[in-house]
């Protein structure tokens, strides 16, 4: 299928050929000069009309040619928008299907009109078991933290280490080194 610019070029060629054929000299077939002059005036008027019509057609074709790139750009943009809409609709459809699946799962587990199935009961048991294990692990972590504190205190007492004194010495050394390097101690 030819595109619009090929069709327009073809029409221009036909119009140009029509102009060339109209400019051929007229043959003198008439018997008297009056009829020949009348025929020349008639053909001159019709030639002027044809030329005006041809110029008008050429102007309209030029106008169409100038609008053609804009139309192509609009079609391209519409295709992109159409593709984006298709993608959005596809995503919405997927989300809707996911929500429906989730609704079915939730409604089967919570629906008071449906008895508790074996699957639901098993799931509930697993959740309760995990909650119980989580509680036990929290207790054990707290116990381990307490044990570490107790062991640290016992170690410090056995070796006669004054933890507060050690911390104060380290802080004093840092302040001293900052003072030597010329750093401001208020940057903390």
UniProtKB/Swiss-Prot annotation:
<dbReference type="InterPro" id="IPR009205">
    <property type="entry name" value="FlaC_arc"/>
</dbReference>
<protein>
    <recommendedName>
        <fullName>Putative flagella-related protein C</fullName>
    </recommendedName>
</protein>
<dbReference type="Pfam" id="PF05377">
    <property type="entry name" value="FlaC_arch"/>
</dbReference>
<comment type="similarity">
    <text>To M.jannaschii FlaC.</text>
</comment>
<dbReference type="GO" id="GO:0097589">
    <property type="term" value="C:archaeal-type flagellum"/>
</dbReference>
<keyword id="KW-0974">Archaeal flagellum</keyword>
């Amino acid at each position: 299928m030819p595109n619009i610019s090929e069709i327009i070029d073809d029409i221009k060629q036909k119009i140009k050929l029509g102009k060339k054929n109209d400019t051929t000299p007229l043959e003198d077939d008439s018997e008297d000069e009056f009829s020949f002059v009348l025929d020349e005036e008639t053909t001159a008027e019709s030639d002027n009309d044809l030329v005006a019509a041809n110029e008008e057609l050429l102007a309209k074709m030029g106008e169409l040619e100038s609008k053609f790139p804009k139309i192509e750009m609009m079609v391209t943009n519409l295709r992109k928008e159409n593709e984006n809409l298709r993608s959005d609709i596809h995503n919405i459809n997927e989300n809707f299907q996911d929500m429906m699946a989730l609704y079915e799962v939730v409604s089967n587990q919570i629906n008071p009109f449906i008895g508790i199935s074996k699957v639901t009961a098993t799931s509930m048991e697993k959740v309760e078991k995990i909650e119980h294990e989580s509680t036990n692990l929290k207790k054990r972590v707290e116990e381990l933290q307490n044990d570490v504190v107790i062991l640290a205190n016992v170690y410090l007492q056995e070796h006669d280490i004054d933890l507060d004194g050690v911390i104060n010495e380290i802080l004093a050394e840092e302040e001293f080194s900052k003072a030597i390097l010329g750093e401001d101690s208020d940057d903390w």
